Amino acid sequence: MAQKKVNAVIHSQEKLAEGIYSMWLDAPEMAKAAAPGQFIAVYTNDQSKLLPRPISICEADKENGRLRIVYRIAGAGTKEFSAYKEGDTLDIMGPLGNGFPLKKKKAFLIGGGIGIPPMLELAKNLDCEKTAVIGYRDKDTFLADELRKYADVVIAT
């Protein structure tokens, strides 16, 4: 699929932890083409911010045509994203990047903080024994329960 910018509708948005948000976007073509480890470029609706924010794809729901991103507020652009509501729209481009190789060997997934979201789609797609070691700065262990559905999870804080 050639990457192109599309205007996606926000299906839902939820605060997972302090400064961490989960957003589902209606983007059927991108969801169908997405692979574990890829990302999308997310544009703000504020035209003074020219550059998109690269955000990893957390999940791709190919059946319903949706992408899930989980992001941390790190500046003005992601702070703007956190104020969006269901039904709002934003421009996205993707899927971008090469993604992760999916080999049928034992997998050891390691990630911390905002590096954890792309591990969820990878764990769902790997057809092998999986252990995920995930780290957090504090007690807010977002996505840990979701990862437990697909891998043995070890938490480091």
Where on the chain are the PLM-derived regions?
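FNR/FR-type flavoprotein reductase catalytic core
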Residues: 76-157
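Ferredoxin-reductase
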Residues: 2-86
